[in-house]
């Protein structure tokens, strides 16, 4: 399956006519890999538009060329965090990273993509490659490339303790592509995909993914009642986490006997809101609104 998919996407990548990807909504996993095979990528700035390679979270590796084309687009240091963590990014951040070439309004995606395709065809538009960092440029050379990948392997080993094979496989595919070219890297992807897909680690992570999604579904019996105010007893790790994820839904009161615990919870919640603002998940105004709904008391 991986070999056939890679062969098809390589036909897109090497097509003599320009192919433009118009992304509106989620482009995750194979969806992003199709876009990466195109010559130009547009994305809408709709809140629902997210891009990423989450396969590693299921014990798999991207098997449609992302270990090669994402590195080609954004460089090693930009691609590895996305490939090794499954991080998802919104359209504007994807533009800054170099994953997409342009961002447009939700209503203008198709029209803008058509204009881009025509401009690429007549030569009036050329894709501007991302300006690589000094480290990424150095990573193209054998001695420093080895150091970058060695550091990445050591970090993966510390974080996974050798229990998850997918991140190691991803690094090997990236290294193969850098050393021997995209064709060899794609072949390496396909070699790894089968054993990972049927391995116990991936099967367990896939089961857990489905179980967590099932647990999020509402109970079939009984009528849900609106939550006007949520009370949380205890401002520890669990309590502050519950408060943080609930602030967007209703006012939250956190109660704890220790002032120190309440102060720590406030810092944790504030940092969580700042991260959401930085990742453009919510606006600064929305973060302030949610923070105003939080009450800490003894």
Predicted regions and their residues:
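Long amphipathic alpha-helix in the N-terminal Rossmann-like dinucleotide-binding domain
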Residues: 1, 118, 192-203
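An acidic, glycine-rich surface segment that forms the CoA-thioester-binding/catalytic face
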Residues: 1-24, 66-69, 205-224, 288, ...
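Short beta-strand element of Class I
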Residues: 251-253
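Glycine-rich beta-to-alpha active-site loop
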Residues: 6, 12-58, 62-63, 234-237, ...
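Amphipathic alpha-helical segments at domain termini/boundaries
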Residues: 33-37, 77, 83-192, 210-223, ...
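Glycine-rich adenosine-cofactor-binding loop
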Residues: 222-248
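Conserved N-terminal Rossmann-fold NAD(P) cofactor-binding segment
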Residues: 257-298
């Amino acid at each position: 399956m991986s070999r056939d998919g890679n062969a098809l996407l390589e036909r897109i990548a090497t097509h003599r006519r320009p192919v433009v990807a118009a992304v509106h909504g989620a482009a995750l996993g194979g969806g992003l890999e199709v876009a990466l095979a195109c010559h130009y990528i547009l994305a809408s700035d709709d809140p629902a538009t997210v891009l990423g390679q989450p396969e590693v979270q299921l014990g798999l590796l991207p098997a449609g060329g992302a270990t090669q084309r994402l590195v080609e687009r954004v460089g090693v240091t930009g691609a590895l965090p996305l490939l090794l963590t499954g991080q998802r990014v919104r359209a504007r951040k994807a533009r800054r990273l170099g994953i997409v070439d342009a961002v447009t309004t939700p209503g203008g995606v198709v029209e803008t993509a058509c204009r881009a395709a025509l401009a690429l065809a007549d030569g009036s538009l050329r894709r501007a490659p991302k300006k690589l960092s000094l480290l990424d440029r150095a990573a193209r050379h054998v001695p420093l490339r080895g150091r970058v990948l060695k550091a990445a392997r050591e970090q993966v080993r510390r974080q996974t303790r050798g229990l998850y094979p997918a991140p190691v496989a991803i690094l090997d595919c990236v290294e193969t592509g850098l050393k021997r070219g995209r064709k060899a890297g794609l072949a390496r992807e396909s070699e790894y995909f089968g054993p990972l897909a049927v391995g116990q680690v991936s099967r367990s992570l896939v089961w857990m993914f489905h179980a967590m999604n099932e647990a999020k579904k509402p109970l079939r019996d009984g009528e849900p009642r609106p939550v006007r105010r949520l009370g949380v007893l205890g401002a520890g790790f669990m309590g502050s986490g519950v408060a943080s994820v609930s602030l967007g839904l209703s006012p939250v009161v956190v109660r704890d006997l220790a002032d120190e615990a309440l102060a720590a919870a406030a810092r944790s919640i504030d940092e969580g809101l700042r991260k959401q603002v930085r990742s453009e998940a919510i606006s600064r105004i929305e973060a302030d609104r949610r923070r105003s709904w939080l009450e800490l008391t003894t």
